[in-house]
């Protein structure tokens, strides 16, 4: 301290303060820089905690379509109204299905009865009256003598008035051809329970503690085989028993019952045969008598599967990497590029309506490109799976899935697995084998995706570098549903390309059916051993589609274009000759002409063109090619009674004249009427007088695959390499490729200074967004 009382600050403290000040200034500058950079980074790469999630887009855009209410399935309210209306008709003597017996009258199914095509087009194009809403009601009339199935059409008036009903033409239908339902199952269960109660010890000893009743968590369950006999006069089925475990179809036991259950008098239903361990017996008592005798028959023992269960989906095996990484995800930076109004979809230049038929599955209507109808109806008609095997069940198992109401088996879809997380999901409602409408959540999905390949591209080089590049990613719209009939899950896709093409795909996955391997069977005759003493049965999967094309109007013809070779003189260098590929076109004039397409001739590649006499600006007839890329041969003889259930499976392609009496190629009843199918597809084209030139045409397309199960199909069949498909491809329909209208094309060329100049109307450096989180979840209830 000096004489004036002031404090002398040492120089070292002054230096320390100065350094500290500079450090603070530097830290402040650094914080400012970090804040600016972080702000820029956050704007470009927002975190999950930010609100900058990807937009949903506009899903309901513009005025409601004129097709609203035309193709939509009946709502729950409409289904209930139709049910209550029919229950009030005292002359029908109806009971509710939960209180009904086989000998009663009850409603089996209610669904939309689509309006006639002519009435729809009169409304859409001529502004005539809107077609009335109608319901198809199927009633099992067990009280009749004889009992039968009767179909009714219930109509709602467009204006004031009461609902009406009338019998549908072509009815009644014989009782024995009706589909399987809960009422029959209850009656069969009593027969099975009586038989398995007697055989309790046999089942318990043979199957390691498993039995049909009083076995706690070691239960067996049964499955009927179709068809139910050969003719309409009989109704029989083999019941296969499997363990009630995950993947039950991979856990069969060698015990089967042959049930005779015709008519409505259940007192006459009985067991005609019993199969056990490769042997058959007339009755359960006969089997037990032999079983209890010392060494009288060969006894079976099939041990219960061990834990972890081989047929389960629970993850097993070694992880593919030590540190699991999340898989790539789809996202939509600007929201969805398609709009939805009810069941009406608009995407780019495409638009269509869709519904879910309870019997046959997905149906698309009024498919337009650039607001011009190309297809009136594109729909799944039927699916079959015919099996081979040693046991009586598999010798007789030939499934026609429409007979099991496969359209009702469109269960919930899981986002991120079954469909991309960005999908728009739709509920469906059915009234089949129930007393109340059943709403199935998220049964259909619609999404846009990048197909992973350019729709078009070209790289032009001058030898030393490039001159230009042009390309367009193939982004498509997909409508998907998955139908699960017991063990198989069939994925059905309708894919819309910006080129004007439509791809239709059917992809089987799920579990295979299997039987216990038998030592006396010739090696690999009916399939391979896919697990310990378990045979994966050989079978096919064939799908049938209806394609009601309206190419530039309803007046169409079809030509067959064959590619062959021709020995041609080279007039430019005589006397040389050349073998050249040539086109040879032949107009199919009669329905019987198109029915001749029963096989694919690889010696003469063939294309089928449905065309209009209207021409494009190059004087070519506007047309659409039908390309059944996955045609599969029906190996069973054409006149075999099993083939007669699905005669369409013989023909890769048939073209017929549109008729209101030929709306479906199969029916709810074809499964159980093999020798006399209720809908005989071959009758569609047996007349030699039905011309198919310049008329409204319908194409019927079959695709499929033959399945040889292998050990890799356990626990589940992979979808890879199993897809069956066909294309509908524009053929001189447009004056140029319609994808040239796309705003997503990329064009790159060099400027004068040799720098790259990229042209695209969609900028890639726009602000990004975070995909919304999607919780994997199932509703699990259908009420």
Annotate each predicted stretch with a short phrase.
Residues 1-15:
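Short, low-complexity, Lys/Arg-enriched N-terminal segments of secretory-pathway carbohydrate enzymes
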Residues 15-132, 136-231, 235-362, 366-499, ...:
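Extended effector regions of multi-domain proteins
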């Amino acid at each position: 301290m000096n004489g004036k009382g002031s404090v002398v600050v040492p120089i070292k403290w002054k230096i320390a303060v100065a350094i500290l000040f500079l450090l603070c200034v530097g830290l402040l500058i650094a914080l400012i820089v970090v804040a600016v950079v972080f702000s820029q980074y956050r704007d470009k790469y927002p975190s999950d905690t930010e609100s900058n999630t990807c937009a949903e887009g506009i899903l309901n855009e513009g005025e409601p379509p004129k097709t609203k209410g035309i193709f939509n399935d009946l709502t729950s309210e409409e289904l209930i109204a139709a049910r209550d209306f029919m229950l009030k008709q005292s002359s029908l003597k109806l009971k509710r299905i939960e209180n009904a017996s086989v000998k009663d009258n009850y409603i089996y199914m209610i669904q939309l009865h689509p309006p006639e095509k002519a009435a729809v087009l009169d409304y859409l194009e001529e502004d005539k009256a809107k077609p009335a809403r109608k319901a198809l009601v199927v009633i099992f009339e067990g009280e009749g003598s004889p009992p039968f199935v009767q179909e009714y059409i219930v109509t709602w008036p467009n204006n004031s008035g009461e609902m009406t009903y009338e019998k549908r033409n072509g009815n009644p239908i014989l009782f024995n051809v009706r589909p399987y339902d809960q009422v029959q199952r209850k009656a069969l269960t009593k027969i099975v329970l009586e038989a398995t109660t007697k055989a309790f010890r046999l089942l318990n000893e043979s199957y390691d503690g498993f039995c049909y009743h009083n076995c706690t968590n070691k239960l067996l369950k049964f499955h009927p085989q179709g068809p139910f006999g050969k003719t309409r006069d009989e109704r029989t089925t083999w019941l296969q028993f499997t363990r009630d475990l995950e993947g039950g179809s991979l856990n069969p036991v060698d015990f089967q019952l042959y049930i005779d259950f015709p008519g409505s008098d259940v007192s006459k239903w009985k067991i005609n045969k019993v199969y056990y361990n490769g042997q058959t017996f007339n009755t359960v008592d006969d089997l037990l008598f032999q079983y209890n005798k010392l060494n009288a028959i060969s006894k079976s023992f099939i041990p219960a599967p061990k834990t972890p269960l081989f047929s389960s989906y629970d993850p097993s095996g070694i992880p593919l990497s030590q540190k699991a990484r999340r898989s790539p995800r789809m996202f939509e930076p600007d929201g969805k590029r398609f709009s939805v109004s009810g069941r009406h979809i608009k995407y780019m230049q495409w638009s269509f309506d869709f519904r879910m038929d309870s019997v046959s599955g997905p149906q698309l209507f009024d498919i337009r490109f650039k607001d011009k109808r190309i297809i009136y109806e594109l729909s799944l008609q039927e699916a079959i799976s015919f099996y081979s095997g040693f046991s009586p069940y598999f010798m007789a198992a030939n499934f026609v899935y429409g007979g099991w109401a496969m359209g009702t088996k469109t269960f919930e879809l899981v986002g991120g697995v079954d469909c991309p997380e960005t999908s728009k999901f739709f509920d469906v409602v059915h009234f089949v084998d129930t007393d109340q409408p059943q709403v199935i959540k998220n049964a259909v999905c619609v999404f846009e995706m990048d197909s992973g390949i350019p729709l078009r591209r070209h790289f032009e080089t001058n030898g030393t570098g490039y001159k230009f590049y042009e390309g367009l990613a193939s982004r498509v719209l997909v409508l998907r549903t998955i139908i699960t009939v017991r063990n198989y899950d069939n994925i059905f896709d309708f894919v819309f390309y910006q080129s004007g093409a439509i791809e239709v795909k059917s992809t089987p996955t799920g579990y295979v059916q299997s039987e216990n391997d038998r030592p006396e069977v010739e090696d690999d005759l009916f399939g391979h051993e896919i697990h310990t003493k378990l045979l994966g049965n050989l079978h096919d999967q064939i799908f049938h589609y209806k394609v009601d094309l309206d190419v530039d109007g309803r007046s169409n013809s079809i030509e067959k274009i064959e590619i062959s070779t021709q020995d041609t003189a080279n007039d430019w260098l005589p006397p040389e000759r050349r073998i050249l590929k040539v086109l040879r076109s032949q107009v199919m004039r009669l329905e019987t002409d198109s029915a001749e397409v029963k096989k694919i001739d690889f010696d003469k590649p063939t294309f089928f063109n449905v065309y209009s006499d209207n021409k494009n600006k190059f004087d070519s007839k506007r047309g659409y090619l039908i390309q059944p890329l996955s045609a599969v041969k029906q190996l069973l003889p054409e006149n075999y009674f099993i083939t007669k259930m699905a005669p369409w499976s013989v023909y890769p392609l048939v073209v017929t004249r549109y008729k209101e009496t030929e709306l479906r190629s199969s029916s709810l009843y074809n499964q159980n009427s093999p020798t006399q199918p209720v809908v005989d597809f071959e009758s569609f084209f047996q007349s030699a007088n039905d011309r198919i030139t310049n008329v409204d045409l319908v194409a019927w397309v079959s695709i499929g695959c033959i399945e040889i199960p292998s050990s890799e199909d356990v626990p589940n069949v992979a979808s890879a390499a199993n897809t069956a498909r066909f294309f509908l491809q524009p053929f001189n329909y447009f004056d140029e490729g319609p994808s040239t209208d796309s705003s997503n094309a990329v064009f790159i060329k060099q400027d004068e200074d040799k720098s790259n100049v990229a042209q695209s109307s969609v900028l890639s450096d726009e602000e990004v967004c975070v995909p919304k989180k999607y919780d994997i979840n199932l509703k699990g209830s259908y009420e």
